[in-house]
Amino acid sequence: MAAGAGGRSAAEAYRPNRYVSLPAELDPAAYDASPEKRRAEAERLAIRSQLKRQYQLQLNDPHRPAVIEDPALIRWAYARTQNVYPTFRPTPKTSFLGAVFAIGPILFWISVFKADRDRKEKLIKEGKYKRPLSLF
Amino acid sequence: MLKIIIPTIMLLPTALLSPKASLWTNTTTYSLLIATISLQWLNPTYFPHKNMTPWTGIDQISAPLLVLSCWLLPLMLLASQNHLQQEPLVRKRTFIVTLTTIQPFIILAFSATELTLFYISFEATLIPTLILITRWGNQPERLSAGIYLLFYTLISSLPLLVTILHLHTQIGTLHMPTLELTHPLLTHSWTGTLSGLALLMAFMVKAPLYGLHLWLPKAHVEAPIAGSMLLAALLLKLGGYGIMRVTLLMGPLTDRLSYPFLALALWGALMTSSICLRQTDLKSLIAYSSVSHMGLVIAASMIQTDWSFSGAMILMISHGLTSSMLFCLANTNYERTHSRILLLTRGLQPLLPLMSVWWLLANLTNMALPPTTNLMAELTIMIALFNWSTPTIILTGLATLLTASYTLFMLSMTQRGTLPTHLTSIHNSNTREHLLMTLHIFPMLLLMLKPELISGVI
């Protein structure tokens, strides 16, 4: 690799930052994997290949089901749509969120509208309310 | 009026006695015929108020809703043909009978001149809808959906019944044209305030208002397509229409009472639009967009000016047609993939290009693109609210922005993107579906040319 400006090598110039993680090819640890890491990799590969085998068994089945379901997707969709209330628990964070996004803005906007309407009512009663677009 | 109600009631024996081969043809063409006869109500020669029978009358805010309810019945029948194909004949007849039972009650509700009759028919539409959702929905969650729908509406309408009976004994009549001539009865006392709240709550739940809207996503999602169309296009409008009718009884109370409802409606429009951006379920997205649009309708109905009522009317009609069309489109997806998950229903534009035209049109009207009537309605409501109080423009403007963003999100998720890999073949769109979409978009396009028909003014 040609040396960059200032004589830095590519590995030094392209460190991971907040927006970009280090690709596997530039990570020196990718090539000396510890035994734990290799075992973990092997486990993940086994899970992936089992899922792929199940999928391909259904895909190439002569009596193929009309829709091949992905159980992980179904669990995820269930968790996001139907399992929200049963797994809800009032915590300081959720109470704060509820107050800030649900109760607070309602009270805020009620007070804003009321203040604005009262101001307008006062102006009308004093006769000072300007109606620039009036047809009269 | 009788020439609409009697044929609608006679639709029941038609559905029960038609031979199998012509069941759908008979009921659909018959209801289409009733719909074309109902178009005469849009003719504005009899307004401000036309008394057709001693108990029913139409004026310019009920006529468009009546025409919409008559128009929607053939569309609902068209949309339900596919998922009922496998059912035995008796169940098909039962389904059509349930659908057509709602029809006379809705017509009666929108044309009632007596508030008690309005209440009775308002409640009567609940039972067939409940049957539709809990019997013909597709997922086991339909039971909880039915319970939410039933109990939310019933709990909020019991105070309404009590207040209606009390007002009847106080005023002596509940005939709505006469009520406009009586002096307002409710004062700022506790009794008056609670009566006013009781009058409004049932319709706020039905409309729905943001804090009371929990039944709506459940009911819309779990209902079969005809149930979703019915709920979105008609039953929600019962709430908006009820608010418009009932606020004439409430007199000086709305000065104080309108603030919480306005804040809830406008903030709710913002909140539900933001929820739409995070939805994983397509029908749920459309259901929350219904809440958002009806929030604007409630806000407009609470300030009770001419322009705001007019905007609320146009929005109710255009939202009815748009939302119903979106549910039909989502149903065509569901019938092909048997899944409502957005990630699984992607990339339809290369697969079904003609249907993507309807998707585009429905989404364009949903985000209130000029020159559709949705835009006319939203602009009218925004201007009326701005005149009422200046800071509302922040909320309505943000709501419009979020509406456009979640609509584009829905469009790009369903039409563009990677094709689903787990499907090997999907049926091509058939003529019935194209006809259904045409019949939805056609009134919207025509109304662009003459919006005075639905705008609630002479």
Curated annotation (Swiss-Prot), chain B:
It is an enzyme of class 7 (translocase). The chain crosses the membrane at residues 21-43, 58-78, 93-112, 116-138, 145-165, 196-216, 224-244, 257-277, 285-305, 309-329, 341-361, 379-399. Its main location: mitochondrion. GO terms for cellular component: mitochondrial membrane. It is a multi-pass membrane protein. GO terms for molecular function: NADH dehydrogenase (ubiquinone) activity; ubiquinone binding. InterPro entries: NADH4_N, NADH_Q_OxRdtase_chainM/4, NADH_UbQ_OxRdtase, ND/Mrp_TM. The keyword Translocase applies. Its EC number is 7.1.1.2. Keywords: Electron transport, Membrane, Mitochondrion, NAD, Respiratory chain, Translocase, Transmembrane, Transmembrane helix, Transport, Ubiquinone. It catalyses: a ubiquinone + NADH + 5 H(+)(in) = a ubiquinol + NAD(+) + 4 H(+)(out). It is found in: Mitochondrion membrane. One of its GO terms (biological process) is electron transport coupled proton transport. Belongs to the complex I subunit 4 family. Core subunit of the mitochondrial membrane respiratory chain NADH dehydrogenase (Complex I) that is believed to belong to the minimal assembly required for catalysis. Complex I functions in the transfer of electrons from NADH to the respiratory chain. The immediate electron acceptor for the enzyme is believed to be ubiquinone. This is NADH-ubiquinone oxidoreductase chain 4. It comes from Struthio camelus. The lineage of its organism: Eukaryota, Metazoa, Chordata, Craniata, Vertebrata.
